[in-house]
Amino acid sequence: YYMKYFLSLLIIFISIKAFAHQPKLIKYSPSIENPHKVIFPEISKAYYGKLSGESHYYIINSEKDFLFYAGILSPKVDENHKWLSLDILDKNNNIIYQADGSQHKWNAWYEPYARDWYWKGPEIGGEINQETGFKKSFLIKSGTYIIKVYNNDNIGNYSLAVGEAEFFGSNTFEKILTWTP
């Protein structure tokens, strides 16, 4: 009995690390008129989406200053990458931060938990985290922000990372059962 209990706990604790970014599958095209709401923007999430001719939009509404990070990945299916860019807009649609994927040197990156290869694109963040190779989040003022994901023809798959802090909510066990091989 104790061995089963111990092994179950071990599997749970090992699997929890796989949720560094809480995965969110976006099955529609979030538009400027109907953007996808980013709840708790400091909590690390990965939004998986597919551009099908239109840019995608994500909105953050925060009543307090918060730590901001955004980065873009593209699935690595061959040696050619499809570049993507990020714009961060204020509530008046002015670009306040931009990560131009057409000018970025995209590098292959292996994601060990999902066991997938990606092209690592541009990021909007602070200094580089030497442990991860990704930028750290930075403090941004309270307000409304829109993240725009796009490229020249608005075609392609992407993973948009928002937030840096790891958090495991009440449905973590459900996610572990769903996502653990």
Where in this protein do the model-derived segments appear?
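Mid-chain, structured segments of secreted extracytoplasmic proteins
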Residues: K64-Y110
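C-terminal edge strands of extracellular/lumenal beta-sandwich accessory domains
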Residues: H21-H36, Y58, D78, L84-N94, ...
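N-terminal presequences and immediately downstream first alpha-helices
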Residues: S8, F19-A20
